[in-house]
């Protein structure tokens, strides 16, 4: 449950944390909090925008399927995605998506943490 998470205990990981509000799947998944590393890798801050508008990765349908698994099936999802960046380097992103619930039943937020590694330029 959301009440079980203390943001102060997550301070070390805040740059890689993203929180998405779930109002209605898939069109009302809204970025509530986006860590500084997530903003840097994306090149802009998607806070307040929908996942459909501002998703990060190579395949929107796969990304939405990850959210569906978390929201509808209440599963933890791990994802690996080698995404080419604007400067020709690959950003290898490892992501974990966790369901959060205010009432212990319905998922109303998704807590995401990701790490990236830059790889050699694409020639």
What are these regions (language model features)?
Residues 1-123:
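Sensory/regulatory domains in signal-transduction proteins
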């Amino acid at each position: 449950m959301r009440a079980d998470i203390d943001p102060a205990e997550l301070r070390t990981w805040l740059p890689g944390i993203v929180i998405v509000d779930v109002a209605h799947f898939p069109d009302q998944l809204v970025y509530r909090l986006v860590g500084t590393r997530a903003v840097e890798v994306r090149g802009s801050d998607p806070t307040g925008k929908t996942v459909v508008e501002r998703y990060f990765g190579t395949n929107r349908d796969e990304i939405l399927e990850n959210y569906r698994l978390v929201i509808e099936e209440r599963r933890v999802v791990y994802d690996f995605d080698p995404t080419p960046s604007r400067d020709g380097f690959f950003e290898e992103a490892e992501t974990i998506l966790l369901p959060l619930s205010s009432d212990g039943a319905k998922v109303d937020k998704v807590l995401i943490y990701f790490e990236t590694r830059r790889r050699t330029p694409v020639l």
